[in-house]
């Protein structure tokens, strides 16, 4: 399928954004021309080479590998650049007429606006508050759309930081210093990103579709581009304005902006805990930011200001009480009549109808629907058929309303249901009083529940999604399986379903399933795979039978799908034996310290479309790795320190989940503590630190990471929630403080904002690299402890390469 219209529209919109950046002064006309002349040249070469390969194949009957991929790129790049080329030619006819003439471009430099210290402080705070708010809310939406895999999370954070760094770098080279215009662009830019999010979703994604990794990267980068570029540009220009007019050192400006981000993080932790929905908050924040800009920079009359305030209050009330999220969910789920939607700390639940059939979507994907007999029966009966008389069953996640009738086909007396998101339980519309057995519903983290709870069960059934993230990976580790076994009766049954089994599994798929299978065999004496709609691993210390149909007859269980009508025991047994023969017994076991299954799952996703694998890797290298080549030597320490802190942030959040569980509110507090450390380090002059040189401070930071690595096992062994949270909270303060102080020391002599621009862009580029490498590669491949040692290695690299003068 060729996205001719979609590609043309998207590229044209990007060209329009670049042109608006030129018209508003973010970059020069020469930069705009160079950028798009280069893009047009590159795409022309790609299109021409693709056409040449196709001509060779047709004329000489050559068998060129990947010709279909070449054809796709030939059509996509040709269609995308055709319209843009026309626009570019029209806008720059004079440029092509005078291409051989020497033209001196006007400087376009304007004086910095004069602002009082109070006004510039408020402006910096608003920039920080709005930027952090939009970041959190857009991240929720993009993670919902893209599937929320670890790499896509890193892609979002990396794209956010890289595009902000582009804006910061552009600010250092731009002569546009009009704070009024800068604030107006900043206030409008989040709305542009929201429009792009809706437009790209409608053009390239089907309802409920999880995009490929390459599509997720491009989608995320394009959505964030308008807001983040202007956000980075605005912050650096305000730093320069504060320095010239109020004599603020860059570190103080950075501190004030960070405080705005802290307040936003804490406030959103409260509002997104079920009080308001995403688009209610996002539109309100955009409205307030625009009102601030109008009232402070464009409106002077008292009556007119009063009118703007009243109008803003009315519009905010309309947004908060009208429920705009239903409209936006309808746009994101075309073809579905959305009847209601609810955001929770853990995701989004949307209720809809299609041709009169009601369905429930969780994070844009179908959660419950009618006639799901095959799925619900496999999820329950493969496990419970192994027991003659199961009396106590633990069901972890999944649809309770759908699965409970299947459980009640057995002589069960007590059913425990663990689901972290209480809104999912509410969406079931289940009358607990009408259930004939004892039903206990717990809205708790299943990892911690099995770790501390003393109940014993005859069967534990895990229906959570695959280990696509480090958070989900916890439920497929040897540690979790050991906790499950402790909660099982001597002949108890445990079953999980890590993912879908392909008829022709590739190496990445086998590596993924092997790591989980080996983790189970290290804990249970018997583990049997059953390949149904998903691959189910049935585990027990007792004998396990895969004669499923025979067991349904013996237990007198009447099913629609799991029965002789649809299944055959000999085929199930043969398939089970085939799966075991393909799995690698030498594959590394999945554990909390080595979450290798998460890495294999992401590798498997990348391998599902081979035509996108190489472009995906090239895109990641260009966007997240190559920016280090643009970092000046004097800023390499800032780059490496920011990269290490970003990686440490990921590690600390994973440690929180492994010790305390998935506790959303504490996550916000820890991030606020990290930002507070940055703010204090960058904004406060601590005299005794001034006597120490930069290299020594960085050595302290590297040593701190080494100490944390050495006590990692102790941190993971802490069972007390208050003690674990306190230790984790305190652990982020020192590295964030020192990293903020490094920014302060590097930029303290900056007079015109140019040094701050390149240092800030280095900070952002380093953070992007750290998020990507640590979360997506290092932790799964080399483990938690070695990854922390790697952070100290990054600091030492910054010391060796970045604390000497340029030659």
Model region roles, listed by residue range:
Residues 104-807:
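Alpha-helical transmembrane segments of multi-pass membrane proteins
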Residues 1-117:
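Membrane-embedded alpha-helical bundles that constitute the cytochrome b-like, heme-associated redox core
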